[in-house]
Regions:
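A short acidic-Thr-Gly-centered motif at the start of a beta-strand
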Residues: 1, 58-61, 361-377, 584-588
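Short, conserved charged micro-motifs
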Residues: 608-614
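Short active-site loop/helix that positions an aromatic residue
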Residues: 11, 73-85, 99-101, 241-248, ...
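Active-site palm subdomain of RNA-directed nucleic acid polymerases
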Residues: 176-188, 578-598
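A common structural junction motif
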Residues: 617-627
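Conserved pre-motif C helix in the palm subdomain of viral-like polymerases
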Residues: 164-170, 564-584
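Active-site-proximal helix-loop-helix substrate-binding element of RNase H-like nuclease domains
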Residues: 24-35, 39-177, 334, 408, ...
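Conserved "right-hand" nucleotidyltransferase catalytic core of DNA-directed polymerases
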Residues: 1-9, 13, 32-34, 113, ...
Length: 644
């Protein structure tokens, strides 16, 4: 038996602060509860006046009944507030089912992408804004919230909107159920719920100090620029450009971060230099991370829900939410302990005296605001060069696998293979290592000059050398280049003929089913491409097209792909499966994971319990499906998070 659920809720806390913070707020309540058992009609309970039926409550506690919702993580979180001891293991998420098929993340967009007869009620946004969000009081209406009795007709519409959401969710589930991922993915999803519910403790003393010091720094920089420029608002790009054009004697095209950095590297007047330095201070967007932490921290002193399961299209990797752990600034300071204490003292002058750039210190300390509970420490372990290891394993590029087996430096080995000379880090031909590193990061998925330039952001490699480096890298890695071609050929053949194709690399299977092109990974998980077809690319050559999210425009429509891109999807997906499997093993060994970032796991453990060495051993254990893949990890133990 299945029970499909959708809830409408109210909270004074904005949902953008995170679902856990939203539900944690004392004003949170479930307004409407729509449900349907199996094929029964959808019922809606108005929880502002009626309790849930006993049959529904019993089902919430019954482990034999599967509970489903479109964004089940939210429904589970809401119901936990009312029924903390109910069953939260036999839940399935229809949104994850859609994401597994590389469909959009929202109910409305999935129904449109699948071209279902059932559609989400378009009145929803207006009704949510009216009943589920606080209103601004006015002189004529001092109320801070709209209640059902304030607008009975709208409330009736809201009930129907809630009902329709379950109708659409059930239609989506019915369409996609035969494409369910392997059972292990449900275990990964449940583990993801545990990690998000557990959350990470925040050092609020550090966060508050960072925000206070930043306010002082911004005020000082603003006043300084006002005096130097005479501008009323020196943070206005238009006003500042006019002033700079007059002082420099030529027109600046743009005022991006890179433009400011390039100007500061030149011989410019001292007042211009100071104004540009102030501009950098005023443009320090990293401070928003501290504000996000302050807004998201819950009553238990922790931030929850920072990871989105299957958040990355096609690869299935996790995506960041709330604080966006995936793009936290790096730290380079040698003594983080001292820097943290000075920041907590809120002494901006001392920060300036010790480090020369208080704003940069605040930026570097963002990671350290995430701390372990008293009596605990973080064990942080990160897979080493996992994508390079995975692509070498799949492509059977033996010399690369030998490098990893011997514990070598892949950047040095790559440069040595390209230039046919020994290369040692800080040793013989050490200057070539950087070229090897850039090539490794840029060329693994068919990238060319553009990819090299993007990876070599500082322009350390002369442009005239790039074509030669690209050619040398490809000649040194013929099995990887063959992987691109084989993936491209297999996908096109399947789309053209409808017949399945296996390629030698990883014994990966390409096949077509129910309107999707599927790529079956070694783990058994599948990558999906909706409505695949063949078309012509901008060069006039045959290309693979499918319906998907345009990552630039963020719209659903035609997307083009090719062999190198398919290999990137495959490699990143295999790396994701390695991480997921390792986290499940760690959890079964008793380790409490509080976060993970890219290929790194963050564990909170009591002091004296567990060890980094054991964590690394568990992470690098092989699975039956990745035999021969040489994994390695490194890490550290510390009372706060940082980049080692």
């Amino acid at each position: 038996m299945e029970l499909s659920i959708d809830v409408e809720t109210y909270s004074d806390c904005p949902i953008k602060y995170g679902a856990q913070r939203y539900v944690d707020d004392t004003t949170f309540e479930i307004l409407l509860f729509a449900y349907s058992f199996d094929n029964e009609p959808v019922e809606v309970i108005d929880m502002t006046k009626d309790p849930l039926p006993e049959r529904v409550v019993d089902a919430l506690y019954n482990k034999e009944i599967t509970k489903t919702a479109f964004n089940a993580a939210f429904e589970m979180l809401c119901l936990k507030k009312y029924f903390p001891d109910a069953d939260y293991t036999n839940w399935e998420c229809t949104s994850v089912l859609a994401l597994y098929c590389s469909l959009p993340a929202s109910l409305d967009n999935v129904s449109k992408a699948l071209r279902l007869g059932e559609a989400k009620d378009a009145r929803g946004k207006r009704l949510i804004q009216f009943f589920s969000v606080p209103r601004k009081p006015t002189k004529t209406n001092p109320k801070t919230r709209n209640m059902p009795e304030d607008a009975p007709e709208k409330w009736a519409e809201y009930i129907e909107y809630n009902r329709q959401d379950v109708v659409v969710e059930k239609a989506i589930r019915k369409r996609l159920l035969s494409l369910k991922p392997p059972a292990i993915e449900h275990e990964y999803w449940l583990l993801d719920q545990d990690i998000n519910w557990r959350g990470v403790k925040v050092d609020m003393e550090l966060v508050d100090a960072a925000l206070a010091c930043n306010d002082e720094i911004v005020e000082e920089a603003t006043e300084s620029s006002k005096i130097l420029t005479g501008l009323e608002n020196p943070n206005s790009t238009m006003q500042l450009k006019e002033w700079l054009n007059a002082r420099l004697g030529y027109d600046l095209d743009t005022m991006r971060k890179d433009d400011v950095s390039n100007l500061l590297a030149q011989d410019i007047p001292s007042d211009v230099r100071k104004v540009l330095q102030n501009r950098q201070v005023l443009g320090n967007s990293s401070i928003k991370k501290y504000l996000a932490m302050k807004n998201a921290v819950c009553s238990d002193g922790r931030i929850h829900g920072m990871l989105q399961f299957y958040g990355a299209m096609r690869s299935g990797r996790w995506a960041g939410r709330v604080v966006q752990l995936q793009n936290l600034p790096r730290n380079y300071l040698e003594d983080l302990d001292t820097a943290r204490e000075v920041l907590k003292s809120r002494d901006v002058e001392m920060l300036d005296l010790l480090y020369g750039n208080p704003g940069d210190v605040i930026k570097q300390l963002i990671r350290t605001a995430l701390v372990a509970e008293d009596g605990h420490r973080f064990i942080v372990a990160d897979f080493s060069a996992i994508e390079a290891r995975v692509i070498a394993w799949l492509a059977h590029e033996k010399w690369r696998q030998d490098v990893f087996a011997q514990g070598g430096d892949i950047y040095c080995a790559s440069a040595s293979s390209m230039f046919h000379v020994p290369v040692e880090k800080h040793g013989v031909n050490g200057h070539l290592r950087q070229k090897g590193k850039v090539a490794e990061l840029a060329l693994g998925y068919g990238g060319g000059v553009g990819a090299m330039k993007a990876m070599d952001s500082k322009g350390e490699i002369p442009e005239k050398e790039l074509p030669g480096i690209i050619e040398a890298w490809r000649q040194a890695s013929p099995r990887i280049t063959k992987f691109w071609k084989d993936a491209d050929s297999a996908a096109k053949q399947v789309v053209r003929t409808g017949e399945p194709v296996r390629i030698r690399q990883g014994n990966i299977k390409f096949f077509k089913s129910k309107g999707f092109l599927f790529i079956e990974l070694p783990s058994g998980r599948r990558l999906a491409y909706a409505r695949p077809r063949l078309g012509l690319n901008r060069f006039g050559s045959e290309s693979i097209e499918y319906d998907g999210m345009d990552q630039v425009k963020n719209t659903w429509g035609r997307v083009e792909t090719y062999g190198g891109k398919l290999v990137e999807n495959i490699v990143q997906a295999v790396a994701r499966d390695c991480l997921a499997a390792s986290m499940l093993r760690l959890a079964k060994a008793g380790y409490k994971i509080v976060a993970h970032i890219h290929d790194e796991v963050v564990i909170e453990a009591p002091i004296g319990v567990g060890s980094l060495e054991e964590v690394i051993d568990i992470m690098c254990e092989p699975e039956p499906w990745n035999e021969g893949l040489i994994l390695n990890a490194a890490g550290f133990e510390n009372p706060y998070y940082m980049k080692d």
